[in-house]
């Protein structure tokens, strides 16, 4: 069996992370070039992620924690909740990266609200 592979799957994205949910939906998140937000895409196939619309789930703070270098998000589904783990820093110390968590308690992470859970 041969599979056509698109390289890259999604342009200008670093630290890609793909999760396949129990319903067969694939979710894609990655660092964006501006390092200022967390985006999510969903599709029924991995190839479909390339054309799926990116939805912004969260934007960086203007100052203080989570205000700079939003980096390497991962999406997970744990015990009925959606979680995104990502790295972020303070605009005054961009290399003091720390891990943070976003949570969605709804069933659809593309439409239901996300909330900040803070630093891990």
Positions of predicted regions on the chain:
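Carbohydrate-active catalytic/glycan-binding domains of CAZyme proteins
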Residues: 1-120
């Amino acid at each position: 069996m041969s599979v056509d592979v698109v390289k890259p799957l999604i342009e200008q994205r670093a630290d890609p992370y793909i999760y396949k949910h129990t319903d067969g939906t694939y979710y894609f998140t990655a660092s964006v070039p501006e390092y200022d937000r967390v985006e999510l895409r969903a599709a029924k196939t991995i190839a479909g992620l390339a054309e799926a619309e990116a939805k912004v789930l969260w934007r960086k703070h203007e100052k203080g924690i989570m205000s700079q270098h939003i980096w390497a998000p991962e999406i997970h589904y744990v015990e009925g909740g959606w979680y995104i783990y990502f790295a972020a820093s303070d605009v005054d110390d961009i290399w003091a990266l720390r891990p943070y968590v976003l949570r969605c308690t709804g069933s659809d992470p593309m439409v239901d609200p996300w909330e900040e859970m803070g630093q891990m």
